[in-house]
Amino acid sequence: MYSFVSEETGTLIVNSVLLFFAFVVFLLVTLAILTALRLCAYCCNIVNVSLVKPTVYVYSRVKNLNSSEGVPDLLV
């Protein structure tokens, strides 16, 4: 039978296609990891803004009120 391409050329084409698909999979995995990290940072920011900052604000506010009035630090 006649062959349209030689064995070496066919192997090169197949290897090139496989390398291209491997690169695409690598890019997809990298993008998925970066997206997950970005989502994690976003969620950590929500926790910081909604829980940590108000707690620190209330703590410092009560401490300032107690120190200015001469009341012992019972609330802190």
From Swiss-Prot:
Keywords annotated in UniProt: Apoptosis, Host Golgi apparatus, Host membrane, Membrane, Transmembrane, Transmembrane helix
Coiled coil stretches, renumbered: none
A GO cellular component annotation in the UniProt record: membrane
Gene3D superfamilies assigned to the protein according to its UniProt record, in alphabetical order: 6.10.250.1810
Subcellular location: Host Golgi apparatus membrane
Membrane topology (Intravirion): 38-76
Endoplasmic reticulum as UniProt keyword: no
Lipid bilayer topology: Single-pass type III membrane protein
Virion surface side: 1-16
Bilayer-spanning residue ranges: 17-37
GO BP annotations listed: disruption of cellular anatomical structure in another organism; viral budding from Golgi membrane
InterPro entries: E_protein_bCoV, E_protein_CoV, E_SARS-CoV-2
Subunit structure: Homopentamer. Interacts with membrane protein M in the budding compartment of the host cell, which is located between endoplasmic reticulum and the Golgi complex. Interacts with Nucleoprotein.
Misc: Bat coronavirus 279/2005 is highly similar to SARS-CoV (SARS-like).
Family that this chain belongs to: Belongs to the betacoronaviruses E protein family.
Described purpose of this protein according to its UniProt entry: Plays a central role in virus morphogenesis and assembly. Acts as a viroporin and self-assembles in host membranes forming pentameric protein-lipid pores that allow ion transport. Also plays a role in the induction of apoptosis.
Name of the protein in its database record: Envelope small membrane protein
